[in-house]
Amino acid sequence: MTARTPAPFTADDYRARMERAARAAADAGLAGLLVAPGPDLVWLTGYAPTAVTERLTLLVLVPGQDPALIVPALEAPDAAKATGAPALTLRDWTDGKDPYAVTAALLETDGRFGISDNAWAMHLLGLAKTLPDSSYASLTEALPMLRAVKDEAELERLAAAGAAADATYEEIRKVPFAGRKESEVAADLARLLREHGHETVDFTIVASGPNGANPHHEAGDRVIERGDMVVLDFGGLLGGYGSDTSRTVHVGEPTDEERRIHDIVREAQEAGFRAVRPGVPCQEVDRAARAVITDAGYGAYFIHRTGHGIGVTTHEPPYMIEGEEQPLVPGMCFSVEPGIYLPGRFGVRIEDIVTVTEDGGRRLNETTREMVIVD
């Protein structure tokens, strides 16, 4: 079985996104946006260069002007194939020409521009030298909501990715665990994600026994034993949108303590989910989940934020973390993933992707959050 891949986006979809981004830039007091290769460029245009090099590629969005993509001439044929290409003007440049001058010709000489967080320093310095009176702001800090609120087509893709992750979990529960290396189970996870439609697999955490106390443990050569708690955290991209799911299974019968801690984490995850509704600050989701774990006496062992946004990448704004006062808005999608990590012993994490609805939240993962016994 493979998850159904939604219909592809159209040039009109990308045109609408670029127009929305340009309006947001103007509302933020910016003269324009300078978007380097990466998630923002993919989201705005559908274009992902096959290789990011020292040659400048940059989307220029200026309110009131047609979008322009500055691109090396040798990359222009591929850029022209991007779904969003009909909605913008390609401005190619050849080796020996100054790409910063090509860019500067489209910009105000003393404007303030939002620039991609992942833009190379050499390109920012080149622009600053060419436009010495200009200034720059982090695109993410200036426009934190640019990709945070998903439309129906994006939600459909995230739901498909979540369904594929659910199907993967249902099947991984059936494979042998005891006597196999973590890396072997991780390979099973990757294979199943691909079988269920993922074009990329970004991570397959299999953290058994004491390794489970490390939230970002990389699956290795440890042989899984009977009596182990095993944290599974896996995801990637399907149809260009992310999945990210965590469940914790037990090899054989768990102890009373292991069941109790799993129940605490499950209750914390449920509390975080129940806190999701429009207008609630992001930090309240973190507080709700964290309170359950703290009240149970394990607050010191919950060592990360409760959640992160997801979309064309598996980690992006908004973040469910103390101090984040951004109100939740219908269409936002993010993880709710509390955990307890006991050093040298074991860990437990339960994670679903949740979307904000008009009257609360909706899970995009439907597999059981109860303790599952595996062989």
Question: Can you name each region flagged by the protein language model?
Answer:
Residues M1-D375:
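Active-site neighborhoods and metal-handling regions in enzymes and metal-associated proteins
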